[in-house]
Amino acid sequence: MTARRARLTAVGWETDLVIESAADDPSPPAGSEIRVAVEACGICYRDIIDRDGRFPFIRIPITPGHEAAGRVIALGPDAKDFRVGDRVASMHREFCGHCRACASGSPSLCEFGASLFGLTIDGGYASELVAPERAFYALPATLPAPEAAILHCTFGTAYRGLARLGELRSGGSVLVTGANGGVGNAAVQVAKRLGAEVIAVVRNEKHVPHLMRLGADRVIVDAGAGFHKQIAQPVDVALDCVGPPTFNSALRSVRSGGTVVVVGNVAADRPQLNLGYVVTRGVRICGSAGAARHDMAELLQLHAKSPLSIR
């Protein structure tokens, strides 16, 4: 069957994606590259802002999509991590694998400018995807492709933010803003499986029943930025999945010596930061995006023990 791909030929919503045929006789993967037959590719908020043209470095034309899952169908001569037939999912980006950040397990901070699927290199809206093997991680045979495709972007982001940067442990407590979104839903579930007390924050009460089913111990409905006033006991970690509108209240929700992990930045405005409050309370503020291979391996172990609702 002829391979096909979607192409974005201009940013903005006036131009439709173009479906075109790829080469009938594609060149074999080079070096450590692998060729993956794509079984599913997710659509998330970043795909929307990619198409909006909010990233000036986007390469046009390009094949969008950074949440791909599928099966390895060909290997480059230097590929060692996978075999033909293995199930894999993409890591959002291609990175060098050798710099200090990559070597320390933080490939999203690659010092040599990681290439981004769907922005600077062709992504997963295609029959096949070719990239270095380090841009993929292994999947279990039992995880359906549609769930596997979105696992890294939502649950991987939540897991790394909570377990790695937030150092959330059993018996701890966490507050999640934007809990009704994809990463927020994932964070509620991940935090609960890590043994934490979970407070979710949303703007609309219609989300309350669903979040309680996912494991939230309490859901605060607050359309403003004063939800910290509704918390009796400051939390160990706040995972801010929104950005400027919720940041300051999230900051004031954590205990002295606690951590605010920022994974959301959906608003263009800038938060007002009281540095004196940060200094005197000893609060850590971390930014995080995506996850590393070892994060995904741990997350998949967590899922095997207590299945997550991935959707």
Which residues does each PLM region occupy?
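Short N-terminal strand-loop motif that marks the start
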Residues: 1-69, 131, 219
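N-terminal Rossmann-fold cofactor-binding loop
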Residues: 201-205, 222-223, 241, 264, ...
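NAD(P)H dinucleotide-binding glycine-rich loop of Rossmann-like/cofactor-binding domains
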Residues: 37, 94-178
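Glycine-rich beta-strand-centered segment in the early N-terminal region that forms part
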Residues: 25-41, 54-103, 140-143
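A short acidic, Gly/Pro-enriched loop at the edge of an enzyme's catalytic core
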Residues: 229-238
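Glycine-rich phosphate-binding loop and adjacent beta-alpha segment
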Residues: 194, 242-309
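Mid-domain Rossmann-like dinucleotide-binding core that forms the NAD(H)/NADP(H) cofactor-binding site
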Residues: 141-224
